[in-house]
Amino acid sequence: MTQTEVKELLNAGVHFGHLTRKWDPNMAPYIYMERNGIHILNLYKTAAKISEAQQALKKIALSGRKILFVATKKQAKDIVAEYSKKINMPYITERWPGGMLTNFITIRKAVKKMGSIDRMKKDGTFETLSKKEKLQVDRMRSKLEKNLGSITDMTRLPGAIFIVDIKRENIAIKEAQKLNIPIFAMVDTNSDPRKVDFVIPSNDDASKSIDKVIGLIANAISEGLSERKIEKEAEMKEAEVKKDEVKEDEVKEAEVKEAEVKKAEVIKAEMKEDEVKED
């Protein structure tokens, strides 16, 4: 990151940690100093960690895997939802559904249930239900949408998860650890960074700080997605060229065979003529 970008982190208040008495000693390598009873993070280290996370997440996006964003705290949920939608990534901003990762098959069934209800409404089946049944189905659909609507496109386990506040999202952390899913996170001075694979030491309480970090991460993922699109388009063009080349070869082969058949017919005709002359 450039000097300007570090200044942007400073302006966003990314460096403000928690009260010194609430600190986790494992965050010591990322702390610059203590001021008025509050720990101040070293933004150069934060910038380096953001860069590291960006590169790794860009690769995951380029591979076609999904990155699941998790942020249920009030000051983070709207920000995370907005950026996730922009880059078409799944996110959880309501209560974490237990077994979201470790019992993914059941979660997928619940998501499919939403699809079934939507189909009922399209094909007219919904109208055959009684008033009470319609109300029950609508309530079920609303509840599913609230908790799982943001992960409908996640057809398999994510390639990584990105968390805001690992203390709050401890269940998500445990599930990801159990399945060896890489964990990226904004980690404040009151949290244990050892639980995370890619630590971004940062203020995970202020909306301005969260917005800055998530924005930088989303940009990197967006770049990965753009590169993937370009690669896919190039592959399709290459496949079309190969298809055309195969067609050309087939046409040439057919022409050669046709020429050989004609030549054989001419030779055959000449032989018949010679036989007639001899007679």
Q: What is each residue range found by the language model?
A:
Residues T46, T72-K73, I166, T189, ...:
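Short beta->alpha junction loops/turns
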Residues P90-V196:
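Long, charge-patterned amphipathic alpha-helical coiled-coil/hairpin "stalk" segments used as oligomerization
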Residues L41, V70, I163-D165, M186, ...:
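Conserved beta-strand segments of the P-loop GTPase G domain that flank and frequently precede/overlap
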Residues M1-K66, T72-K73, K77-M120, K131-K134, ...:
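N-terminal cationic and glycine-rich segments that engage phosphates or anionic surfaces
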Residues A172-I230:
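Short glycine/threonine-rich loop/turn motifs
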Residues M1-K7, E223-D279:
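Intrinsically disordered, compositionally biased charged tails
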Residues G13, F69, I161, V213:
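Residue-level signature of catalytic and energy-coupling elements of molecular machines
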